[in-house]
């Protein structure tokens, strides 16, 4: 009987340890920031929202007020009349951890049911491998999301669009209620990472780019593999139920989630980050100015 009890206790202990391990792994996969912590072939930048405008220099260039309201993140000069040169000239005044990231990042504004705008809490922009990617071409423009109003069940690694609680899962097609865990809500937008090798933009701002296949290869039509860019944008609200985006016209709240990216970085530093971090298989999360990991 003593041996049987000992065996039973051992089995229960092992089962408990296995369950704890599975829960820990599930949490790490579900966490926007934690999922990337300790990974290699990645660099990231943390930025703050700098201003809001009904402008879109990719979709409506040169036409102020022609778009829905956007949260412009990082570069404080971004507007309808922005150019590559005006964006790069903002170095020294951007709201990012590294002043070399003068890139263009923007997402639709989020509103409460009463019409009050929800501020952006913080944003992380991840650039991931695997190793062997090409440099993101200067002046590349692209839009991700917005055209997929009924996405499949989003996950951390599949599906270009999702909502979650900060540092927690699961992932949803609409903003969730995170009050039970005391966390704000977060939007995730995954950009395509295969370029056609020719066009820096296209009429729909999407066709010159494609997502890689399930085999992690680029289609023949878009053979140039560049870093996978992911926006993780946290909003300062815990209960996202009933919130809606400025782009949600006649669709359920949050399902028009999309984002715009414009490569107006300091190109020399961006090249260093791609070479040293992604292609060098290093973890360069939270890049700073004069970051030793780029040396």
Regions of interest found by a model, annotated:
Residues 1-9:
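N-terminal secretory signal peptides that target proteins for export/translocation
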Residues 9-25:
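Sec-dependent N-terminal signal peptides
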Residues 24-42:
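C-terminal region of N-terminal signal peptides and the immediate post-cleavage residues
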Residues 36-67, 71-189, 196-295:
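Primary mode marks residue(s) on the alpha4-beta5-alpha5 output face of response regulator receiver
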């Amino acid at each position: 009987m003593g041996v049987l009890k000992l065996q039973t206790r051992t089995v229960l202990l092992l089962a408990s340890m296995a369950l704890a391990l599975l829960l820990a792994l599930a949490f790490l996969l579900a966490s926007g920031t934690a999922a990337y912590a300790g990974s290699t072939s990645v660099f990231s930048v943390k930025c703050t929202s700098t201003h809001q405008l009904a402008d879109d220099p990719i979709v409506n260039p040169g036409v102020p007020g022609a778009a829905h309201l956007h949260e412009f993140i990082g570069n404080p000069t971004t507007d309808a009349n922005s150019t590559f040169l005006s964006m790069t000239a903002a170095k020294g005044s951007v709201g990012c951890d590294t002043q070399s990231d003068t890139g263009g990042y923007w997402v639709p504004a989020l509103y409460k049911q009463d019409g009050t705008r929800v501020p952006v809490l913080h944003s992380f922009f991840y650039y991931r491998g695997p190793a062997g990617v090409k440099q993101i071409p200067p002046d590349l423009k692209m839009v991700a999301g917005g055209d997929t109003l009924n996405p499949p069940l989003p996950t951390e690694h599949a599906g270009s669009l999702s909502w979650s609680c900060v540092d927690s899962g699961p992932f949803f097609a609409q903003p969730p209620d995170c009050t039970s865990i005391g966390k704000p809500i977060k939007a995730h937008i995954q950009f395509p990472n295969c370029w056609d090798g020719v066009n820096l933009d296209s009429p729909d701002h999407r066709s010159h780019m494609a997502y890689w296949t399930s085999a992690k290869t680029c289609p023949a039509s878009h053979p140039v593999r560049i870093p996978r860019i992911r926006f993780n944008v946290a909003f300062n609200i815990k209960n996202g139920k009933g919130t809606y985006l400025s782009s949600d016209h006649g669709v359920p709240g949050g399902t028009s989630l999309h984002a715009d990216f414009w490569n107006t970085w300091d190109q020399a530093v961006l090249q260093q980050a791609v070479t040293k971090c992604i292609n060098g298989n290093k973890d360069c999360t939270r890049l700073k100015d004069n970051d030793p990991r780029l040396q």
